[in-house]
Amino acid sequence: VFGGSMGEMHAAKITRTIEMAERSRTPIIGMWDGGGQRAHDGVTSLAETGVLMDHLVQCSGRIPIFSLILGPVVGASALCAGIADFTIMSSQHGQLFLSSPLVTPEIISGEQTPKEVGDAQVHSSRSGIACLVAEDEDDAIEMASELLGFLPDHCLADPPFAYSGDERDLFPELNELIPDNPNKPYDMRK
């Protein structure tokens, strides 16, 4: 609807979902694909999006935040997506822009295409926003699911543990590398 743009009501719904995740201390997973804010909603849309961003920032570092960039994401939605701890972009359709690529001088002049300015390759190699690049939406969802498997169900639980039984996986010398005293120096190259 309206190119996946976010209105006041939609930002408020997402904010309430984030509040529930914060109360239950469970990860937040945002699947982003849309054209930014709804112009016809005016400033009210931006105000509620500001509340949404504030909630995401408050959760950052306290509960895991995942962003899956599955299509073009523009404007304030791109800022929200960038707050995540883990960002996975689909190389098939994922694009991230702060403003519409159609008003970017390099694109207007024909020097670059929207793909060259904001696709998964750019954000994984140059901007650093994308942690992982997926082939398509299904691959991005699979990657997020795999990452979630390394985390506990909520932030107060212990992470999952799977003993492999392979002695080669054990490195007792790791216990000696970093001293117990945080003021004591150690060799970072080891």
Annotate each predicted stretch with a short phrase:
Residues 21-23, 45-46, 88-90, 175-183:
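Short low-complexity stretches enriched in small and charged residues
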Residues 32-156:
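Conserved catalytic cores of soluble enzyme domains
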Residues 10-14, 140:
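Helical mechanochemical/support elements of P-loop NTPase systems and associated helical scaffolds
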Residues 1-8:
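STAS-typified acidic loop motif
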Residues 132-189:
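Terminal amphipathic helices with adjacent charged low-complexity linkers/tails
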Residues 1, 13-39:
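A structural preference for short, pocket-lining loop segments at secondary-structure junctions
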Residues 7, 100, 113-119, 170, ...:
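Alpha-helix initiation/capping motif
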Residues 13, 108-110, 179:
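Glycine-centered secondary-structure boundary/capping sites
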